[in-house]
Regions:
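Append "and occasionally in soluble cytosolic enzymes with long acidic Gly/Pro-rich linkers
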Residues: 314-315, 321-327, 333-337, 423-538, ...
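N-terminal lobe/hinge region of extracytoplasmic solute-binding protein
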Residues: 76-135, 306
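Gly/Pro-rich hinge or "lid" segments in bacterial periplasmic/extracellular proteins
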Residues: 116-118, 222-245, 254-255, 260-352, ...
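Detector for C-terminal structural segments
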Residues: 25, 103, 265, 322, ...
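Secretory targeting signatures
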Residues: 1-60, 414, 419, 431-432
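Extracellular/periplasmic solute-recognition and catalytic clefts
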Residues: 314-326, 354-419, 442
């Protein structure tokens, strides 16, 4: 997906609720290029269905059935190519925070609960045999599945679960910090202690050791380094630490694990269902570098480690150019009963995942049946993809092309609310009403008359009904007269002038002209981005605004941690790590907690957001979301770009492909059949 995750740890004053993957995710978003729109473009899109576009070649009817070249091997050329993320960044689930990582994390490691098929709102127990929710969504108790082993033979128990959750935070990496802030740790304590620890853990250390761990933070770090790098549940002191009741993570018994949150939180199971909830083997970790405060495990990052999942890592290519998976010979799901579908044993033994392949290689691999899963960079390549397909006389385009649905995240151009001239609300409203959003949709996200995206009004996307636009606000209208009205007000307030193409001078007619505007985009520029920016450039020129474009890199993005350092306009996207539209979409967009480039910072909104994520009454939440929508709509901090659909190319014999908009797809459910 295009979803971008800032890889920055929690700072002394900010919570980075990185919403990405997702992060957001095991397949590339349809960041799609299009054909030209019809001569008359409707004011609103005429379709939001996911019907596949249909080139119409001549199909020869026959009994021919394409077979995989090797029924024991699946080749995935998608590689989940994000801008700037062509390969995994790490194979340790406590470090990795990039879309390409999911091929390993989804299939080698497992969580207590995992997504139920394609549903983003439902989970099923996996490493937990069952769970209970207590104390008004503030306490979660898990019974750990017995007779489970890691692929190296080490048995799983509740102590391993405790170790994994503590380690996820203690390494100090963005993936843990972003997904547990304000839930199991208080980010305000990080600067004081120089550690990211679950709440109550330092008190547990002090209770078990008699040492001043709550005041001597260097000593506390030394104790934790020693304990986690020489993890031994048979040690009475370590056991006392884990069993201490007044902390975030508590071991209640060899197969019972409890989580106590800082706040009631209805979506916690959805949070831990992805790889930052993965359970790792303490013995392996300790034998390969151990655990140290704010320090990644270089060996684990480079090579991966044993998990409890259906696959294990067989080999890792140079610079993560490819990863090969093979069946976990000790997989617990082979002989277990009532195994959830997401955890079923694998059907195809060998999985080859290729990363960063050039488009021509992907086209050739799929055309010749070498690859079973692939991706075209944009719809402009759809015809090329199908024209090269050696079996097109037997299979229509729709038989190998699948639209999987909308991206749960949002695409945007931020307008820096703290920096001239976008700090003026009338200026931002002028921009909003000067843009033809429908033109953008039809120009950039359609193919052969089929829309491959939809218009939205953020910050929530339609995937999250009923939190999406609960007040039914209209989309910003394309209205040049209204745009000119707002621009005229802004010019008078900010003392600038703008001359329209017809000679009309807006703003303060005696003031200097407003200088050129620059929209920053993530380099390299995709064809979709280019088309969308050119439409916006043309639209704004009708107001007399001069607009240019400038690429930026991920390293530049990570430096934009203040409003003053951030450009006025930034073209990006943001996606949720888990299915909480409030904490994962609204909070990043309308507060400064995640460094989104609009830097929206309104006391009325901040006051609502202080409690909104932790309310347990959905009706009350929706009413407050409606208030935030109304405020944000009139404040206009973002240009909401169309939401692109997710798509994939599959060979016709590939079955059991189950896509989840947040966790992607898993190889163990896939099988080959022509039925």
């Amino acid at each position: 997906m295009r979803t971008l995750k800032m890889k920055t740890a929690v700072s002394t004053t900010k919570i980075i609720l990185v919403v990405a993957i997702i992060l957001i995710i095991a397949i590339s978003v349809g960041v799609l290029l299009s054909r030209k729109p019809p001569s008359t473009i409707p004011s609103t899109p005429t379709s939001t269905t996911y019907t596949s576009p249909t080139p119409t070649p001549s199909i020869t009817t026959s009994n021919f059935q394409l077979e995989p070249p090797n029924k024991s091997v699946l080749v995935d050329d998608v590689g989940i190519p994000f801008p700037g993320d062509l390969a995994p960044d790490a194979l340790d689930p406590a470090t990795g925070f990039s879309g390409p990582d999911t091929a390993v994390f989804n299939n080698v490691f497992q969580e207590l609960v995992e997504p139920n098929g394609s549903s983003i709102y439902q989970v099923v127990p996996v490493l937990a045999s069952n769970y209970t929710i207590e104390n008004n969504y503030q306490t979660y108790v898990f019974s750990i599945r017995q007779n489970v082993k890691f692929s190296n033979g080490d048995p799983l128990n509740a102590y391993d679960v405790w170790f994994s959750f503590v380690r996820e935070l203690y390494l100090g990496q963005a993936v843990g910090s972003s997904n547990y802030a304000e839930l199991t740790f208080n980010p305000e304590n990080v600067s004081a202690t120089d550690m990211t620890t679950p709440w109550g853990l330092l008190h547990a250390l002090q209770y078990a050791t008699g040492l001043p761990a709550t005041t001597n933070y260097k000593l506390a770090s030394q104790i934790l380094n020693q304990m986690l790098s020489h993890f031994n549940p048979d040690n009475a002191t370590q056991l006392a630490v884990m069993e201490y009741p007044r902390q975030a993570y508590v071991v209640l018994g060899p197969y019972t694990f409890e989580v106590n949150l800082l706040h009631p939180y209805r979506f916690f199971l959805l949070d831990i269902a992805l790889w930052w909830g993965a359970i790792v083997d303490p013995t392996f970790v300790d034998e390969h570098g151990g655990v140290y405060n704010n320090t990644v495990n270089a060996y684990f990052d480079a090579n991966g480690g044993p998990g409890t999942g259906p696959y294990e890592i067989r080999s890792v290519g140079v610079s993560f150019s490819s990863i090969v998976l093979q069946p976990n010979p000790l997989y617990w799901g082979i002989n277990a009963t009532n195994v959830p579908a997401v955890a079923q044993p694998p059907h195809i033994p060998i999985i080859v995942v290729n990363y960063g392949l050039p488009q021509n290689t992907r086209i050739e691999d799929f055309a010749t049946n070498k690859a079973q899963i692939s991706l075209a960079d944009s719809p402009s390549l759809f015809n090329e993809f199908y024209d090269a397909y050696q079996y097109k006389q037997y299979y229509s385009f729709n038989q190998i092309f699948k639209i999987l649905g909308p991206n749960p995240g949002f695409y945007y151009i931020s307008m820096n609310t703290q920096k001239y001239p976008t700090n003026n609300v009338n200026f931002r409203l002028a921009i909003e009403h000067a843009i033809n959003y429908t033109q953008i949709l039809y120009d950039s996200l359609s193919f052969n008359g089929t829309l491959l995206g939809q218009l939205i009004l953020g910050p929530v996307t339609p995937s999250f009904t009923p939190f999406y636009n609960p007040g039914n606000l209209p989309l910003y209208s394309f209205n040049l007269n209204l745009a000119a009205y707002y621009l005229n007000l802004a010019g008078k307030q900010e003392d600038f002038s703008v001359t329209m193409p017809n000679g009309t001078v807006l703003g303060n007619t005696s003031a200097p002209p407003l200088g050129p505007l620059t929209i920053y985009y993530l380099a390299p520029e995709s064809q979709v981005t280019r088309i969308q920016l050119e439409v916006i450039q043309n639209d704004l020129s009708q107001l007399g605004l001069s607009v240019g474009f400038q690429g930026f890199t991920l390293s530049m993005l990570n430096q934009w941690t203040t409003p003053q350092a951030t450009p006025n306009f930034v073209d990006l996207e943001w996606g949720p790590d888990w299915a909480d539209p409030i904490l994962q979409l609204i909070a990043p967009a309308v507060t400064t907690t995640s460094y989104l480039q609009a830097w929206m910072n309104l006391s009325s909104v901040n006051q609502i957001m202080a409690t909104l994520p932790f309310l347990t009454n959905q009706t009350q939440q929706i009413q407050l979301v409606k208030q935030i929508y109304n405020i944000t709509y009139n404040y206009a901090p973002y240009i909401w770009l169309p939401n692109a659909y997710v798509y994939v190319f599959l060979q016709p014999y590939v079955k059991g492909f189950v896509y989840n908009a947040l966790s992607g797809y898993r190889y163990n459910t896939i099988y080959y059949s022509n039925q």
